[in-house]
Amino acid sequence: MKDDAELLSKAREGDERAFAELVTRYQHIAWSVCMRITENQHDAEDALQHALASTWKNLSRFRGESKFGTWFYRIASNAAVALVRKRKQEKPIDDDEDGYFIQLEDTAAAFEEQLADHDRLSIALQQINADSREALVLAEVAGLTYAEIAVHQNASLSAVKVRIHRAKKKLADLLEK
């Protein structure tokens, strides 16, 4: 298995397979970051696609001051935030009341419980303000340091610490109910 530096070097030379192998290592967490920020599967897919394209296009700008994964998560987060901002500016279209429903096969009680926990977490996260939610997701899901989040959010380190602390406290309070 090749290390990130070797794959990055080949990707910078235009090797698409090396790029695919490199981003595949981090794609799951980047997807989670996009999903938590956009709160919508379709928007998360769009944000991740934008992040992949932007990462490929800007490989030459990666300076190596952080790990590649951290840089990729930051691009994914930026893409998700930009998409959310864009969606807020658009006029909402009324959904068809009949809608489309996905029926999940009842395979196990554990699966249902996991879905319920996921739904509770998603609902609770929606009740946290956007900056705090983003900081929490970047710290807990993407594994960014507080300093990296501060740079990403253009905020002080203490502001990021406060955001994450308050987000965790509010999340715990909401999940206790």
List each model region and its residues.
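Short helix-capping/turn signature of helix-turn-helix
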Residues: R25-H28, R36-I37, V137-L144
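DNA-recognition helix of helix-turn-helix
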Residues: V81, A124, S132, V141, ...
